[in-house]
């Protein structure tokens, strides 16, 4: 049977099969690094180091001793894994002091990697397979290496062409060879998104982020770092005149510019996902209940129209 319970003006469906109740997954804690610009203030840190910092910051904020064994597992999204070493999520988990017995999994679903990590963690909680999990993502686009692909075929390294892992594995469609910027242009044409629409949206985003930092709203989630105290890519003084004066990057007369596109960033974030029962027992806040989620796929060249993840 399905029992409907009204909590915080939401309806949570709790399925009961042969007397077994599905747990309700909740977000009980969060922490992240400030996000750095490409080759910016966080360039000295690898993705694993950033992930370690986010996990450590989360545990500290929750007053959970890393060695306590409270955390049943870790899921971390990471797209640019080239050169990061085996099992980046496990590296970050152990780097944060979690016990050796703690399993960790690295996920690559491109833009949706860390959201997929949260979905999997929530599913484990609902199924009763885990009680407390950490889910998040980590990336250092700055430190994505160059690779000599031809060298593996016997070509001398000095004669091999170098390929950017950031571009090849992260910013280029594997099927059409188009850059993500072009796929954005395709959807802008298809959906009738104008240059002024994109610039206006970008200005609103920067303005809101700037206001949030100025009012101290972001300080509770961003951990303290020695060389970066806030997100580095926010343009506090941006105006519509500045944005509209930038040249399109990918198509003449196109929509996507350096001012209205997503930033190439370095950073990491982590959430504590647990059952509602556990949160209440431990006295942890119930920040959000994970009610449901879905995923789907579209034609690769139309990736910017896809839901994330």
Which functions belong to the PLM regions below?
Residues 132-186:
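Flexible glycine-/small-residue-enriched beta->alpha junction loops
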Residues 32-33, 44-53, 61-64, 196-281, ...:
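N-terminal extracellular/periplasmic Venus flytrap/periplasmic-binding protein-like
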Residues 68-77, 103-108, 133-137, 197-204, ...:
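Beta-strand segments within the central parallel beta-sheet cores of soluble alpha/beta enzyme folds
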Residues 22-84, 88-96, 100-103, 183-195, ...:
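Conserved active-site "lid/cap" helical segment
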Residues 107-139, 182, 188-217, 270-277:
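Active-site-proximal alpha-helical scaffold in enzymes
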Residues 45, 78-131, 175-180, 237-263:
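Conserved catalytic cysteine-centered active-site region
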Residues 276-309:
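Glycine- and Gly-Pro-enriched alpha-helical subdomains that act as flexible
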């Amino acid at each position: 049977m399905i029992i409907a319970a009204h909590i915080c003006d939401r309806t949570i469906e709790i399925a009961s099969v042969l007397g077994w109740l599905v747990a309700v997954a909740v977000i009980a804690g969060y922490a992240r690094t400030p996000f750095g610009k490409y080759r910016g203030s966080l360039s000295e840190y690898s993705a694993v180091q950033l992930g370690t910092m986010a996990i450590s910051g989360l545990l500290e904020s929750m007053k959970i001793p890393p060695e306590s064994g409270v955390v049943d597992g870790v899921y971390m999204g990471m797209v640019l894994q080239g050169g990061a070493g085996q099992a980046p999520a496990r590296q970050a988990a152990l780097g944060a002091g979690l016990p050796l017995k703690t399993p960790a999994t690295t996920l690559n679903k491109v833009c949706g990697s860390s959201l997929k990590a949260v979905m999997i963690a929530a599913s484990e909680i609902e199924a009763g397979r885990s009680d407390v999990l950490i889910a998040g993502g980590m990336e250092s686009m700055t430190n994505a290496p160059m690779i000599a692909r031809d060298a593996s075929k016997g070509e001398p390294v000095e004669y091999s062409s170098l390929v950017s892992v950031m571009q090849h594995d992260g910013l280029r469609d594997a099927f059409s060879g188009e850059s993500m910027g072009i796929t954005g242009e395709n959807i802008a044409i298809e959906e009738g998104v104008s240059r002024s629409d994109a610039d206006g949206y970008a200005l609103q985003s920067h303005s809101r982020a700037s206001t949030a930092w100025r009012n101290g709203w972001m300080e509770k989630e961003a951990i303290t770092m020695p060389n970066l105290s806030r997100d580095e890519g926010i343009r506090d003084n941006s105006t519509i005149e500045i944005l509209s004066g930038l040249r399109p990057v990918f198509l003449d007369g196109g929509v996507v510019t350096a001012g209205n596109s997503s930033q190439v960033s370095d950073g990491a974030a982590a959430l504590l996902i647990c059952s509602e029962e556990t949160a209440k027992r431990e006295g942890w806040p119930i920040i959000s209940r994970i009610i449901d989620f879905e995923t789907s796929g579209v034609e690769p060249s139309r990736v910017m129209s896809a839901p994330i993840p």
